[in-house]
């Protein structure tokens, strides 16, 4: 058996110096203890090294595994069939990867490609990075095209195109085109187009287009579209904003045109500026500065500065009006109020129907407090307090209650039932009971006793008298 001499390494040794090598187990020279050979130190180093110089200047590549470092100062340290084509590019491992961008990096994976300077792909499959100083973390079939300083964290089939300083964190089939300084967190099929400083948190099939500083937090098939900025959809499904400075909190199938808010609910619509729908379903605002708090199928049509609190199928058709609630109430007059009830109709300006059912007023500055089928027609300053089927057709008149009364004289009043008036300045009563009247002998005694002209007193014989 051959033994090696224990000696220190001589100084000044170079790769061209010859050395004596004994390979134990090699009996080709007839010696059972091994064979001896002469070689330079460089020849021995090349024989045992895993790496070799690539075709690029000062480049390095792993030997014998179809790796190519073509760029100057490039490195391919492992994997199979990888190519570093540009200067200072690096591929650590994987298979079929190509680093053709200056100072670009591929960590591993399969069939990944970097094209622009400073681009990075950490791993994954079939990813393409064509953005300067951009990053793809992994996943498969994620593409960055002409999007500088941007990132795709992972997921699959995500696309960043012409969107500088933007991020898609992950998810599937998310797309950002012309969306500088924007963000998609994840989800599926979300899209941002021609909108800067915008945000989609997640969800599915959400879209932002042509509107800057827009936000969709999540949900399904929500859409922000139109020119402008500062619109937000927090969640829900099939919600749409078509203008700027607007908000939808959630719900489904809600629509905001511009500068308005829908908090939630379903199938609610605002077609104007500065309006609000709190919730409910099927509510619609057509004119500006109006509010519907909730309910169903309530509508403000040609009505600015109007309010519907709730109820169902209530409608306001003129400005500065309010319906508190109820069902099928309609206000046509400016500055009018319906508190609630059923099928009340108000055509007069600055008039009020507090409640009841089927009450109507076409008079201005008039009031129907309640009851049923009561009507104030084409007059002003009149009042029906309640009752059933009462009608006023004159000014400055009133019906306290009762039923089937008809008042057609000015400054007249009805207290009772089935009364028809026939003169002005008169109060009409079916029956009148007066109790605890003072008793006096005559008119002089009544005046002396403190009564005033027009007061009523009783004589000792039971007669009623009026002081004169």
Question: What does each of the following model-derived ranges do?
Answer:
Residues 1-5, 34-75, 425-453, 459-468:
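Glycine-rich, low-complexity segments
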Residues 9-12, 417-420, 456:
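A general structural signal for short secondary-structure junctions and capping/turn motifs
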Residues 11-12, 16, 425, 454:
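Glycine-centered loop/turn motifs
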Residues 19-22, 414:
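Solvent-exposed aromatic/hydrophobic patches embedded in short alpha-helical segments
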Residues 23-28, 189, 419, 461-462:
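Acidic glycine-/aspartate-rich tracts in secreted/extracellular proteins
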Residues 24-33, 436:
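Short, surface-exposed beta-strand/loop "edge" segments at domain boundaries and coil↔beta transitions
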Residues 49-437:
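Periodic small-residue-enriched repeat registers in elongated scaffold domains
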């Amino acid at each position: 058996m051959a033994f090696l001499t224990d000696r220190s390494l001589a100084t000044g040794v170079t790769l061209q110096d010859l050395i004596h090598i004994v390979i134990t187990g090699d009996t080709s020279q007839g010696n059972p203890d091994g064979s001896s050979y002469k070689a330079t130190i460089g020849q021995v180093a090349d024989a045992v090294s895993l790496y070799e110089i690539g075709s690029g200047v000062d480049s390095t590549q792993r030997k014998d595994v179809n790796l190519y470092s073509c760029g100057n100062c490039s490195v391919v340290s492992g994997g199979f069939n990888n190519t570093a084509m540009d200067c200072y590019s690096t591929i650590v491992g994987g298979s079929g990867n190509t680093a053709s961008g200056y100072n670009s990096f591929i960590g591993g994976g399969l069939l990944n490609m970097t094209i622009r300077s400073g681009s990075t792909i950490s791993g994954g499959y079939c990813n393409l990075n064509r953005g300067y100083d951009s990053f793809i973390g992994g996943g498969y079939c994620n593409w960055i095209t002409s999007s500088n300083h941007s990132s795709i964290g992972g997921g699959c089939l995500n696309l960043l195109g012409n969107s500088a300083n933007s991020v898609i964190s992950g998810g599937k089939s998310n797309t950002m085109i012309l969306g500088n300084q924007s963000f998609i967190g994840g989800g599926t099929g979300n899209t941002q187009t021609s909108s800067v400083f915008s945000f989609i948190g997640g969800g599915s099939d959400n879209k932002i287009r042509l509107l800057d500083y827009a936000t969709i937090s999540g949900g399904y098939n929500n859409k922000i579209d139109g020119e402008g900025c500062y619109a937000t959809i927090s969640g829900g499904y099939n919600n749409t904003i078509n203008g700027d400075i607007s908000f939808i909190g959630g719900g489904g199938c809600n629509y905001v045109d511009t500068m308005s808010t829908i908090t939630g609910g379903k199938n609610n619509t605002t077609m104007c500026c500065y309006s609000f729908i709190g919730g409910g379903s099927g509510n619609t605002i057509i004119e500006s500065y109006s509010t519907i708090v909730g309910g169903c199928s309530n509508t403000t049509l040609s009505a600015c500065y109007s309010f519907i609190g709730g109820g169902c199928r209530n409608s306001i058709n003129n400005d500065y009006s309010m319906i508190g609630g109820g069902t099928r109430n309609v206000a046509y007059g400016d500055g009018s109020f319906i508190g609630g009830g059923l099928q009340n109709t108000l055509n007069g300006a600055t008039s009020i129907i507090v409640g009841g059912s089927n009450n109507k007023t076409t008079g201005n500055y008039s009031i129907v407090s309640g009851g049923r089928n009561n009507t104030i027609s084409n007059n002003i300053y009149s009042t029906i307090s309640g009752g059933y089927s009462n009608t006023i057709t004159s000014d400055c008149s009133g019906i306290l209650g009762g039923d089937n009364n008809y008042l057609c004289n000015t400054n007249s009043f009805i207290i009772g039932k089935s009364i028809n008036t026939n003169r002005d300045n008169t109060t009409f009563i079916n029956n009148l009971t007066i109790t605890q009247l003072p008793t006096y002998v005559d008119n002089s005694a009544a005046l002396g006793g403190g009564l005033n002209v027009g007061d009523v007193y009783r004589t000792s014989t039971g007669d009623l008298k009026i002081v004169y």
